[in-house]
C-alpha cells in the first residue's frame, strides 16, 4: 500500500489488527506523510489512544473512532478521547458520527473503552456457560438474542469479530 496517496486527506481511520506496534508504525508514517491538520483516528477495540498517539507529533489530532461490528447495522460510534485530543478533533469525529447516522458515545481512554469492557465479560460468561454445560452454544445465543434483543448472540458475535481479535481485546 502506497501511503503517499493519503497525504491530502482530512481524516484517516486506521483499522488494522489489534497490535500496538503495528498501529504506532502506521500512525508514525502517516504523521510524516499527511498535512498537519489531518485527523488520525484509530478503530482500535481496546488499545489506549494515548499510546498510539505517541508515535506522532500531533497527539491533539489523534482520536479513537470505534465502529462496532457489524458496522452497517450498529447504530453507534464509540469516540475515545485521549487526554491530548483537542476539542476540534473530538468535535470533528462527533460530527462524522452524526453524518453517518450513528449515535456518538464518548468513552474515556481506558483499555476496552466502554463497549468492550462490558462485551468481553459477556462473551467470557457465555463461553463459561457452554463449558460448564449450563447450555449449548445455540441456547446461549438464542436466549441473548430473544431476551436481550441483541442482533446476534455473544458466541456468534465472538466468531464474527474473530476469536483472535477477541483474545487480544
Residue ranges and their predicted role:
Residues 9, 23, 72-76, 122-123, ...:
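N-terminal alpha-helical segment
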Residues 1-39, 47-51:
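Rossmann-like NAD(P)-binding element
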Residues 80, 84, 105-169:
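Substrate-binding/catalytic subdomain of NAD(P)-dependent oxidoreductase enzymes
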Residues 8, 36-37, 59-62, 138-139:
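Short acidic capping loops at alpha-helix termini that bridge into adjacent secondary structure
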Residues 12-15, 41, 93, 126, ...:
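Buried hydrophobic positions in well-ordered alpha/beta secondary-structure cores of metabolic enzymes
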Residues 39-109, 116-117:
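Rossmann-fold dinucleotide-binding core
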Amino acid at each position: 500500500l502506497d501511503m503517499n496517496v493519503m497525504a491530502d486527506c482530512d481524516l484517516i481511520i486506521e483499522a488494522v489488527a489489534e497490535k500496538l506496534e503495528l498501529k504506532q508504525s502506521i500512525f508514525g508514517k502517516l504523521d510524516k506523510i499527511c498535512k498537519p491538520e489531518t485527523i488520525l483516528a484509530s478503530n482500535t477495540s481496546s488499545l489506549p489512544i494515548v499510546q498510539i498517539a505517541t508515535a506522532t507529533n500531533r497527539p491533539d489530532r489523534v482520536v479513537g473512532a470505534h465502529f462496532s461490528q457489524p458496522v452497517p447495522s450498529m447504530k453507534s460510534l464509540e469516540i475515545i478521547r485521549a487526554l491530548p485530543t483537542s476539542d476540534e478533533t473530538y468535535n470533528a469525529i462527533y460530527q462524522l458520527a452524526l453524518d453517518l447516522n450513528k449515535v456518538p458515545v464518548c468513552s474515556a481512554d481506558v483499555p476496552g473503552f466502554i463497549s468492550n469492557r462490558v462485551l468481553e465479560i459477556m462473551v467470557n460468561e457465555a463461553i463459561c456457560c457452554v463449558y460448564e454445560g449450563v447450555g449449548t452454544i445455540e441456547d446461549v445465543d438464542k436466549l441473548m438474542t430473544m431476551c436481550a434483543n441483541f442482533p446476534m448472540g455473544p458466541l456468534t458475535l465472538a466468531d464474527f469479530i474473530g476469536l483472535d481479535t477477541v483474545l487480544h481485546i
